[in-house]
């Protein structure tokens, strides 16, 4: 099974912990997402999905109702949309059904701390399926695909 190794960026949250950021590519544009091993599902900012994803999904496995996605940031109403292609390192996810949340407050907090804007949160659905290994010492994420 091929593997891809992706560099991680460590950001300090004013001595109140840290987050790891991962670069993804959508439509040949680079974007950052937060790596969150505690998030059961990856989520993307609703403005990001409005710009890059296709119309809302009708996938029966993913029901968009209130309080569907809980992350380290919030519990919120959700929308589901599909990204034709989402690239993480050399791994390409086709027709990825994405949960969309309003991450405005997250990005405002990051901005106040001098950190870059994030497009979403990389969660357990992708991390588990692709046997994620996080090397904190070397700041690398390894995914199998």
Residues covered by each model-derived region:
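Pepsin/retropepsin-fold aspartyl endopeptidases
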Residues: 1-145
């Amino acid at each position: 099974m091929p593997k891809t190794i992706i560099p991680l960026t460590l950001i300090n949250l004013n001595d109140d912990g840290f987050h790891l950021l991962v670069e993804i590519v959508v439509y040949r544009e680079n974007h950052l997402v937060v790596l969150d091993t505690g998030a059961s599902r990856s989520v993307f900012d609703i403005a990001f999905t409005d710009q890059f994803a296709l119309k809302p999904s009708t996938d029966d496995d993913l029901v968009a109702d209130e309080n569907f996605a809980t992350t380290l940031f919030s519990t919120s109403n959700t929308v589901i949309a599909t990204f034709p292609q989402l690239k993480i390192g050399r791994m390409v996810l086709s027709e990825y059904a994405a949960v969309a949340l309003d991450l405005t407050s997250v990005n405002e907090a990051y901005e106040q701390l001098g950190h870059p804007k994030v497009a979403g949160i990389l969660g357990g659905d992708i991390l588990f399926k692709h046997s994620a290994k996080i090397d904190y010492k070397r700041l690398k994420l390894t995914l199998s695909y």
